[in-house]
Amino acid sequence: MNRQRPVALVTGGRRGIGLGIARALAAKGFDLAITDVENDETVIHELRGMGGKVAFFRGDLAAVETHAATVAAVLKEFGSIDCLVNNAGMGSVERGDFLGLKPENFDTIMGVNLRGTVFFTQAVVKAMLAATEVRFPRSIITISSVSSVMTSPERLDYCISKAGLTAFVQGLALRLAEARIGVFEVRPGIIRTDMTAKVAERYDTLIDGGLVPMKRWGEVGDVGAIVAGLAGGNFIFATGSVINADGGLSIAKL
């Protein structure tokens, strides 16, 4: 297969931050493999209109047993994977006091955010390392959250899942450094998406009060621009780095 463009695989690329990332990568010249639990033909059509090849692959991140087949389908369609963006994830099943946290809810979020991401990455890395030809810079970019280091007691399970990703990224960066695959973590802060729309009024007040030093919401395009920059290959020597996409939210203050 004669490839003229690099290929990025974006999990959860159908909406929200994932869609913002997909748009930015398409604008950067990437072909796109989008995975999600549901398809949205309008989104796929929009991304194809940006000039590259785009294909959708249905997949549930929690279903680890399906990961190898999903990666194989992507390879059959595109020939290789140059960039993996681990974006898919979920919030707490129920917010509330830690004393009321249910084991089944804890297992659900870990199954998607941590276990699912770790083993999907494993499947992609095996394919990357097996590639006989490397034509473009390669990277694995994991979208975690400022919640990996800034805790919220009412959604402690979510914070734990993101903190686990932080540890994973560091170990993965060491494992893949010699293969010259850049590994990065991007931590979004308060980002305007359909998931945050239900608490927009609360966040508006907090942002106006100075919680975010830039005093504005983050947009999905802010995260997308960071990911596209990392995927381009110019920051390979900074492997293992963490980028806070939060307008200064996580800066330690007196």
Give the ranges of each region predicted by the language model.
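Alpha-helical segment proximal to the catalytic Tyr-Lys
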Residues: 126, 174-175, 236
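Substrate-binding pocket helix/loop in short-chain dehydrogenase/reductase
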Residues: 95-98, 102-107, 208
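Short, small/polar-rich loop/turn modules that mediate ligand/substrate recognition or access, typified
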Residues: 177-182, 238-240
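Short C-terminal tail/terminal secondary-structure segment
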Residues: 95, 210, 228, 239-254
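Conserved glycine-rich cofactor-binding loop
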Residues: 14-15
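Active-site helix of classical SDR
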Residues: 121, 161, 169
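Residue(s) in the substrate-gating loop at a strand-loop-helix junction
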Residues: 145
